[in-house]
């Protein structure tokens, strides 16, 4: 039997209550995902990501207890290249600090996975999920499980090699962009349950808002490559790089495409100039929305994105000039996530809420 699409003004009080509960569940997942990314950023900035050298999805929940277990964990760390080449003078107490960062990152990952899976099962078993959104909600725990596997795949890249003291920048960037995709997806889903006071925008505005989210994700991806190659700790001047607007050595690697992923100078250059490009696109977008839907909530959101981009650019410059201190690095990452989430909210709000299904 074909589904009948209804107008949302015919939603029953029970359907509205169910939607509100699902939305709260999705927002809880979103908050945990944001926390995981920030703890992951701290884990990276403190060099803690390789402190746990194995992956035990169940038993790994329990940290070392007592001096003997701590010493055993420390001995495992002493077998990898990061300890041998960088941290030979590390004490057990110093090891505990980096261990706790990585442990917290993994625990948060398990928590969000359980929240997503158990929440989905409960809403499905109690028949609170409408047919047209069941598949979308099912994708959430699948993506989170996939992200957990990517996380270990990333860590493994820095453990199995005798000459590597950090994880692969390719895998780090993939890990972060997958997390950002999950954040984008969950934000988009959760906002779809909101009844908007503003009418939907036209299709051109909707598409422009969607492409803006794509551009923000690209900028975050190159930011991850900057982090993976420690490119923020070189060429710490602005607006020039090494005394030049377009520095020498941008294409020094062969083949040329390798510079986009392995040349710190090129990657920092792209991250800088893509930020300028993104700023101009957000301005164009804001005026375009204002022209099409003047003095609307949509246009106000579009202009606020411009403000957020300016703040983020200022933070990026200060972080670069100060050679990426941990605090500023985390603030820069936090604002990037805020821009992403708000841009997704703006994009989703240009459309109508999920329609009721009979």
From Swiss-Prot:
Name of this chain's protein: Heme A synthase
Its EC number(s): 1.17.99.9
Described function: Catalyzes the conversion of heme O to heme A by two successive hydroxylations of the methyl group at C8. The first hydroxylation forms heme I, the second hydroxylation results in an unstable dihydroxymethyl group, which spontaneously dehydrates, resulting in the formyl group of heme A.
Location of this chain's protein in the cell: Cell membrane
Parts of the chain that traverse the membrane: 22-42, 107-127, 139-159, 173-193, 208-228, 269-289, 302-322, 324-344
Assembly and binders: Interacts with CtaB.
A single cellular component GO annotation: plasma membrane
GO BP terms: heme A biosynthetic process
Primary location: membrane
GO molecular function: metal ion binding; oxidoreductase activity, acting on NAD(P)H, heme protein as acceptor
Protein's gene: ctaA
UniProt family annotation: Belongs to the COX15/CtaA family. Type 2 subfamily.
């Amino acid at each position: 039997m074909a589904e009948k699409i209804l107008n949302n003004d015919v939603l029953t009080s029970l359907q509205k209550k169910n939607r509100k509960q699902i939305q709260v569940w999705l927002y809880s997942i979103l908050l945990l995902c944001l926390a995981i990314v920030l703890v992951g950023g701290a884990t990276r900035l403190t060099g803690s990501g390789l402190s746990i050298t194995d992956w035990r999805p169940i038993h790994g929940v329990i940290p070392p207890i007592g001096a003997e277990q701590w010493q055993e964990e420390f001995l495992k760390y002493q077998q990898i290249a990061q300890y041998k080449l960088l941290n030979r003078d590390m004490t057990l107490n110093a090891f505990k600090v980096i261990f706790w960062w990585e442990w917290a990152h993994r625990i948060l990952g398990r928590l969000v996975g359980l929240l997503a899976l158990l929440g989905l099962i409960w809403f499905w078993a109690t028949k609170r999920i409408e047919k047209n959104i069941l598949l979308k909600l099912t994708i959430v725990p699948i993506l989170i499980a996939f992200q957990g596997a990517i996380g270990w795949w990333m860590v493994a890249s820095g453990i199995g090699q005798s000459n590597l003291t950090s994880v692969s920048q390719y895998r780090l960037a993939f890990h972060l962009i997958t997390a950002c995709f999950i954040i984008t997806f969950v934000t988009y889903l959760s906002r779809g349950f909101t009844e908007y006071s503003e009418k939907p925008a036209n299709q051109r505005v909707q598409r422009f808002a969607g492409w803006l989210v794509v551009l923000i994700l690209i900028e975050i991806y190159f930011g991850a490559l900057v982090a993976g190659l420690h490119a923020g700790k070189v060429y710490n001047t602005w607006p020039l790089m090494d005394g030049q607007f377009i520095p020498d050595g941008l294409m020094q690697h062969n083949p040329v495409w390798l510079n986009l992923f392995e040349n710190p100078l090129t990657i920092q250059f792209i991250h800088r100039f893509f930020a300028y490009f993104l700023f101009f696109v957000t301005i164009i977008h804001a005026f375009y929305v204002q022209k099409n839907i003047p003095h609307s909530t949509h246009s106000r959101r579009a202009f606020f994105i411009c403000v957020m981009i300016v703040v983020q650019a200022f933070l990026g410059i200060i972080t670069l000039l100060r050679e990426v201190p941990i605090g500023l690095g985390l603030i820069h990452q936090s604002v990037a996530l805020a821009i992403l989430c708000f841009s997704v909210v703006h994009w989703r709000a240009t459309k109508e809420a999920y329609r009721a299904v009979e």
